[in-house]
Amino acid sequence: MLRTSIASSRPLLPSSVCPKAPAQWLCTSRARRVNTATRRYHALARKSNAGRRCSLTPNTATTSQFFQKAASSTSTKPPGPSDADVRSPASPSSRSSLRPESIPKPPQSPPVQGQTSPGSEVLPPDHESSTPPPPPGPKSSRLRKLLYLFLTAGLAYAGGVWYSLRSDNFYDFFTEYIPYGEEAVLYLEERDFRNRFPHVTKQINRRVTVPKDEGAQVTIPSGSGLSWKVAEEQQEATDMTKKGRRMGTAHANEPTKDIKVAEKAKEEVKSKSAAKKEDVAANIPIQEALEPQPAKTEEKNLEAPRQPAVPAVTAIERLVQDKADEPVVQDLVKVFNDVISVISADESASKFAGPIAKAKEELQRIGDRIVALKKDAQESAQEEIRNAHAAFDKSAAELIRRIDEVRTQDAAEFREEFESEREKIARSYQEKVNTELQRAHEVAEQRLRNELVEQAIELNRKFLSDVKTLVENEREGRLSKLAELSANVAELERLTAGWSDVVDINLKTQQLQVAVDAVRTTLENSDVPRPFVRELAAVKELASNDEVVAAAIASISPAAYQRGIPSAAQLVDRFRRVASEVRKARLLPENAGITSHAASLVLSKVMLKKQGLPTSDDVESILTRTENFLEEGNFDEAAREMNSLQGWAKLLSKDWLADVRRVLEVKQALEIIETEARLRCLQVE
């Protein structure tokens, strides 16, 4: 029934979770049967873990619950292609409760027929004789995910450490925000440095692990402490400037036993540490000389509880190093001066005067030795630098020589290649030029042949045309001549008509010229003014279509051609009469009376006439210039001069000016008409 419920609930599963398959016992294919058995195995495992018994008559609730478990197990681990060979286990009974871990693996033997439950009536099909592998055990996806997470985190961490060694920006980020990132990067950098420079690390380790020589053990004698004789112990420290009991100076210059022991220990230490470096050997005697002093002080304090009444304190001079520009020497001097300050503050400072003095000498020698070593090191460094410079110069010269050789060799090779390429290019260019010339020659020859053919064709066409023309001429001999004669006659008629028009125009022009001459003759030959209305009417009739002539005639005053105009002689004669009257009135003002007229008349008789061409603007000068213009026949300028008069002189010459204007108007009109007649003649020609 369990298998039946699985088969009935399988079509309800989505296609993405489990592919659709037919019923379990209706399948004939071996692969489908084994795949169905695998799904049933997982379903049984889920069912047994739940601790429930299978019912022979499944209901809807049981089927839906089993469907949910089968779907979860299928989605957790879908069967793969390798599950097709898994053998189908025997079907359990309705009351059986199995766990997946309690199911034993089947042996590698031919499978037997499947068993059915007591209530089942369907018999299982026979399995084929095959040896499938044992069913795989359930795998834990959580452990696999955790393993993948650890591997991914480890790879990411290793990649971050590796990239931190390559990028400075990522190094800052990695060491600041990633735990233990800085330690990992520093460890890799240190390993890389040791791999690149193994000798440097060896020297550092060797220098650090050098054992420190403690020197010989110093033994303090029993009598080197304080004594009950205060005066003898304070002989060297007696202050002669203070009041009180003076101590003897018999033993003032004798060194104490402690100083002797310290000097002996110092000599032993120097003999043992002679093979060490000078900077280490210089520090050891000072330490050995100063180490016993605190013990002595304690012993004295224990043995002599009483202090002298007036202890004499002797100040020890501080060490002054002339060559204290070295850091090591400065540190030594500072430490030694601190020791001196401590000893000077003690009451028994006089006991350490000797060791301090020798220590000063040792420090002085050490400073000198350090300076000498530094100088030697500088000299050796300079020598090495000079040697390196010489070697570099030699190597550079050798390199330059090699480069020159290679350059020369390359230049020769390039020159050879250039020559060969140039020859190839010249050869190819010459071949190309020859080919082009040959083609051009062939094209020119073909063009000449074509031109010759065209000329031959043109000559044949021209010959045929000439023959045809000759034939036509011979055929139409007289007819062609008649046509030519008719054309000539038509041309003559056209020319005759044109010349008739020219003759008419010339005739009218001549008539107009004759009429103008008649008007001029009438005006010049008359002694008195005569009207010339008929002559002017004849001119107007001949030039009826000419606007210029009509305008010139219209510009003449009607009084001029109706009454006539005076001649030149008449104008000159009248001017003389007018000039005599003007001279009489030339001195009159505008509002002159009878007395002024009489005075002007009298004075005019006295005044002399001017001759020539005067340039002034008085009345006499104007009259003289006007008379000269009239004698020359220049009436226009004469009228201009008379028009410039003022007052009574202009008033007296007003009538004469009007006659001169009419004469000038008529002359100007006649000149315009004559000019127009000449223009007509020129147009016809």
Swiss-Prot record:
Ranges annotated as biased composition (Low complexity): 87-101
Top-level taxon of the source organism: Eukaryota
GO terms classed as biological process: cristae formation
Role, per record: Component of the MICOS complex, a large protein complex of the mitochondrial inner membrane that plays crucial roles in the maintenance of crista junctions, inner membrane architecture, and formation of contact sites to the outer membrane. Plays a role in keeping cristae membranes connected to the inner boundary membrane. Also promotes protein import via the mitochondrial intermembrane space assembly (MIA) pathway.
Organism, as annotated: Ajellomyces capsulatus (strain G186AR / H82 / ATCC MYA-2454 / RMSCC 2432) (Darling's disease fungus)
Residues in the Mitochondrial matrix compartment per record: 43-145
Coiled-coil intervals, chain numbering: 356-494
The protein, known as: MICOS complex subunit MIC60
Mitochondrial intermembrane side: 166-685
Subcellular location: Mitochondrion inner membrane
Family: Belongs to the MICOS complex subunit Mic60 family.
Quaternary data: Component of the mitochondrial contact site and cristae organizing system (MICOS) complex.
InterPro entries in the cross-refs: MIC60
